[in-house]
Regions:
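N-terminal secretory signal peptides that target proteins for export/translocation
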Residues: 1-2
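Sec-dependent N-terminal signal peptides
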Residues: 5-14
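Glycan-processing catalytic domains of CAZymes
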Residues: 26-407, 412-446
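C-terminal motif of bacterial Sec signal peptides marking the signal peptidase cleavage site
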Residues: 18-21
Length: 446
């Protein structure tokens, strides 16, 4: 177990942010900067396991993965080799989410082998189903939830199901999406072991005549799950990141991985998985993060850098609870409605009308600002450049935030966590394509 330490942010100069001293009378301010315990870990997973060797899982761990969905590509479910694979991964610092496939037409006792992992410290939970329909949720998944509570009673093993995205047809879903989420929330409310999860895979970066487009339904899906997560007090909001080109999704670069991470975090996501980690057995899938032997590709190093950034900020970001998202239409965006609202934002249902402690925000590109609060009541903001990173320098975003009262800002950006002085309650962030920052404004008494 990590020793609990306190993360203290020191004053530092920087070139990405506007800096200077700001006068203040100190009324209602803090006597010292907020500090955050170093006892948290961002859950970063991989889909499609590498070969079950020490070397392969060492490579996964060094990329920054903390867990993997352990399928049966190299070791059959319930076999001694599967158990050895989980132990080998654990020795390298990679936990396991057990996999049942979809368990179609199979009774719960077909999975009694999983109960043997009840006390295994290398297992974080069990994945029972990928994309169930409403009837499947209302029957099979409810039965699995009861079985899980009984088999894993008194343990930290989580119950996990990955949900359909909003674009699935009603013929497939067999019900409305609102009904779908409501049914799932009822199931999760009855979970008695581990942490509660809500998960979705929505891959937003698509091929287009211009080279790339961002799916217009992505944010709507994220906000729906974020609302259910908040209303139902679900612990873990998990999302898959597109890392392998397939179907009508485009090739992915480092900026695209970072972009997906920051947009997801604007909606409070606190666990992410790369789809896929290893080269898929499906030959239509492009290069993944590692090849079939588990050897790194160029994309591996892209993901490794993004993971370093996520882990650098985890103790700050994970100390906050999500409250909502405020959208800012970029001044350079020409695709707006009659009210000047971005095409990506105008159909959102639950966006905030304002940010607490913020007078106004301007941005050159479409920008998402997720609002958060820590245990002491301090506000935190994920500021995510929403412009498609495919277009490089054209997608650079300058964001200016006018706070009501702030003379310092703790800023997580890249692998840095630093505190900056703020001029006249105003902070300017220069975000490159795909970038974001986590900002904690502070009114510090002098």
């Amino acid at each position: 177990m990590k020793m609990k330490k306190l993360l203290a942010c020191v004053l530092s100069a920087g070139i990405l942010f506007s800096l200077a001293a700001c006068g203040g009378n100190g009324n209602g301010g803090l006597s010292e900067l907020p500090t955050y315990e170093q006892d948290k870990e961002f859950l970063i997973g991989g889909w499609d396991v590498p070969p079950d060797t020490e070397e392969a899982f060492r490579i996964a761990s060094e990329m920054g993965l903390t867990f993997m969905f352990m399928n049966a590509t190299f070791a059959g479910y319930g076999t001694d080799r599967y158990r050895e694979m989980i132990a080998t991964a654990g020795e390298q610092g990679v936990k396991s989410m057990l996999m049942f496939g979809n368990g179609q037409n199979q009774p719960q006792n077909a999975y009694e082998w999983a109960a043997a992992y009840k006390d295994d410290p290398n297992v974080i939970g069990v994945n029972y189903w990928d994309e169930p329909s409403v009837p499947t949720l209302d029957s099979t998944i409810k039965e699995f939830a009861k079985w899980h509570n009984a088999q894993f009673a008194g343990t930290d093993k989580s119950f996990y199901v990955n949900l359909y995205p909003t674009y699935v047809s009603s013929d497939v879903l067999k019900g409305s999406y609102d009904e779908y989420l409501e049914t799932y929330a009822e199931i999760v409310a009855g979970a008695e072991t581990g942490t509660s999860w809500i998960s979705v895979d929505y891959y937003p970066l698509k091929l287009a005549a211009s080279g790339s487009t961002v799916d217009t339904g992505w944010l709507g899906n994220l906000e729906m799950l974020a609302k259910v997560r908040k209303d139902s007090d679900i612990d873990t909001f998990h999302s898959f990141l597109l890392s392998t080109q397939h179907m009508d999704y485009r090739e992915i670069e480092e900026e695209d991985l970072r972009y997906q991470a920051w947009v997801n975090m604007a909606y409070g996501v606190n666990a992410m998985t790369y789809f896929t980690y290893r080269k898929s057995l499906n030959e239509s899938f492009s290069t993944a993060l590692v090849d079939m032997q588990g050897n790194p590709t160029d994309k591996y190093y892209d993901a490794q850098q993004v993971n370093k950034e996520l882990h650098a900020m985890e103790n700050v970001y994970l100390s906050f609870d999500w409250e909502g998202v405020y959208t800012v239409t970029g001044s350079q965006n020409e695709y707006v409605d009659a009210n000047g609202v971005s095409d990506y934002f105008r159909r959102l249902q639950y966006s905030l009308n304002s940010l607490e402690g913020v007078k106004s925000v301007e941005a050159t590109q479409d920008t998402l600002i997720g609002q958060f609060r820590d245990a002491e009541g301090n506000k935190g903001f994920v500021v995510a450049n929403f412009a498609d990173p495919y277009y490089g320098k054209e997608s650079a975003d300058t964001v200016t935030i006018h706070f009501e009262h702030a003379n310092r800002a703790i800023i997580c950006h890249g692998t840095d966590v630093k505190t900056y002085e703020v001029t006249d309650n105003t902070l300017t962030l220069n975000l490159q394509a795909g970038e974001g920052a986590f900002v904690v404004p502070v009114w510090l008494n002098r």
